[in-house]
Curated annotation (Swiss-Prot):
Its main location: cytoplasm. GO terms for cellular component: cytoplasm. It is found in: Cytoplasm. This is Histidine ammonia-lyase. It catalyses: L-histidine = trans-urocanate + NH4(+). It is an enzyme of class 4 (lyase). GO terms for biological process: L-histidine catabolic process to glutamate and formamide; L-histidine catabolic process to glutamate and formate. The keyword Cytoplasm applies. The modification 2,3-didehydroalanine (Ser) is found at S146.
Length: 513
């Protein structure tokens, strides 16, 4: 993938741009039209200080200490202290890709001109992104309100020459990170520490990654599902547009259309059993548009929410320069992100659950009319027997992980922050769930290709044959038992590259052009 050259117009990021940011390094610049609003909001903060007005986050403490007035000589110390004290996360570091996406989201939000932060602070974040210097940010420690305080604090420590960062896979000090980017440690002005820390950007970055994973899984599951229909000599009639039109769900209709797109009438396998006596297929084949359509709807709904959040201002307090006003609110509360992530979790789990059932059908000779466990000379050969057990284990694990996180809340900050979203965990677990579902799909991919080879000399449709050939370039037909795990890994690697997206109809998935 070519490096994205992105000129940021604050509040105008697209899902496709965000997908690219999450997948590869970028060259980022700020559109000049954003500068006046940034400078005007900074001037409002400067007037507050000059006029000795009391405003939360500028010259007061934070959280339960909001009523504590801070002396003018301590204001710079206040901003430095909030960054260092709030950098209290634990656990493994976020992936560089996640940190990059989080930083771009934070830059986008700050550049809207409602945060009272100076242009040179925003430019420092841009310079770090362009130098591919990514702060080391622990994954755990945020409850998604008041924003993602700990993760964003860890991000911000590097601006002070503190903390750690990663460059070319090597962990370095914050001071060394700045040197690589050609920067010096900064002294934060009033409001700037809080502006950097307040926001939903960590949760949203995790959730966006989950969205993009879910989209790729949807495409692969549709392709693998169509392959399984062919391998099991399933009927195409359940994909007839009339069935789905009378129900009326747009995503179900679109899902059925995707199966028709893959299973076109040129298939020799389809023609070979067009007059068979079988009346109905099991649900895992027949009800794919209904189940996958529901998953697609959750993906689309979540995409809409996350696109809005990605371009939002989730700081507090907010600076409205046109009114010379600063207002405390609660845009940092990540409930929309948490609920979107919970719905993505349901979709990812169901995509995997349905795939596992299709694979189980293929190895059952009574249902698929294929050799037991998809291998000749059964007994001597066990074939795909234990691969299905692996799929079942992964599907079961996802059922637990899919439990909604947004229904949980624990009060924090001495009950000042008495309801929180748990958005960070809601979104963070999507990667693990995606890996589980990708593993399930890898097993189905292998199984369906094996089943299709047993239907030779008949061939499937061109797109299904293309999908099978992608796999056969890496994994050969099973004529007898062999070491299985490497083949699952090869199939998994193909799925991780989102190779099946090109086989899908255009404009089906929100972030895929």
């Amino acid at each position: 993938m070519d490096m994205l050259n992105l000129t940021l117009k604050p509040g105008c990021l697209s899902l496709n741009q965000l997908r690219q940011v999450s997948r590869s390094p970028i060259n980022l610049s700020l559109d000049a039209s954003a500068i006046p609003a940034i400078e005007e909001s900074t001037q409002v903060v400067e007037r507050v200080i000059a006029e000795d007005r009391t405003v939360y986050g500028i010259n007061t403490g934070f959280g339960l200490l909001a009523n504590t007035r801070i002396a003018p000589e301590d204001l710079e110390t206040l901003q430095r202290s909030i960054v260092l004290s709030h950098a209290a996360g634990i656990g493994e570091f976020m992936a560089d890709e996640t940190v990059r996406l989080m930083m771009v989201l934070k830059i986008n939000s700050l550049s809207r001109g409602y945060s009272g932060i100076r242009l040179n602070v925003i430019q420092m974040l841009i310079d770090l992104v362009n130098a591919q210097v990514y702060p080391c940010v622990p994954q755990k420690g945020s409850v998604g309100a008041s924003g993602d305080l700990a993760p964003l604090a860890h991000m911000s420590t590097v601006l002070l020459g503190e903390g750690q960062a990663r460059h070319n896979g090597k962990i370095i000090s914050g001071l060394e990170a700045l040197k690589i980017a050609g920067l010096e440690p900064i002294t934060l002005a009033p409001k700037e520490g809080l502006a950097l820390l307040n926001g939903t950007q960590a949760s949203t970055a995790f959730a966006l990654e989950g969205l993009f994973i879910a989209e790729d899984l949807f495409a692969s599951a549709t392709v693998c599902g169509a392959m399984s229909v062919e391998a099991a000599l399933g009927s195409r009639r359940p994909f007839d547009p009339r069935i789905h039109r009378v129900r009326g769900h747009r995503s179900q209709m679109d899902s059925a259309m995707a199966y028709r797109h893959l299973l076109d009438t040129s298939s020799e396998i389809g023609q070979s059993h067009s007059n068979c006596e079988k009346v109905q297929d099991p649900y895992s084949l027949r009800c794919q548009p209904q189940v996958m359509g529901a998953c697609l709807q959750q993906i689309r709904n979540s995409a809409e929410i996350l696109l809005v959040e990605s371009n939002s201002v989730s700081d507090n307090p907010l600076v409205f320069a046109e009114d010379d006003d600063i207002i405390s609110g609660g845009n940092f509360h990540a409930e929309p992100v948490a609920m979107a992530a919970d719905n993505l979790a349901l979709a990812i789990a169901e995509i995997g659950s349905l795939s596992e059932r299709r694979m189980a059908l293929l190895i059952d000779s009574a249902l698929s009319k294929l050799p037991p466990f998809l291998v000749d000379n059964g007994g001597v050969n066990s074939g795909f027997m234990i691969a299905q057990v692996t799929s079942a284990a992964l599907a079961s694990e996802n059922k637990t992980l899919a439990h909604p996180a947004s229904v949980d809340s624990l009060p924090t900050s001495a009950n000042q922050e008495d309801h929180v979203s748990m958005a960070t965990f809601a979104a963070r677990r999507l990667r693990e769930m995606g890996e589980n579902t990708r593993g399930i799909l890898a097993v189905e991919y292998l199984s369906a290709a094996q089943g299709l080879d047993f239907r030779a000399p008949h061939k499937s449709s061109p797109r299904i044959e293309q999908a099978k050939q992608m796999l056969r370039e890496k994994v050969s037909f099973y004529d007898k038992d062999r070491y299985f795990a490497p083949d699952i890994e090869k199939a998994n690697s193909l799925l991780k590259l989102a190779m099946h997206n090109v086989l899908m109809p255009e404009a089906l998935l929100p972030s895929v052009l």
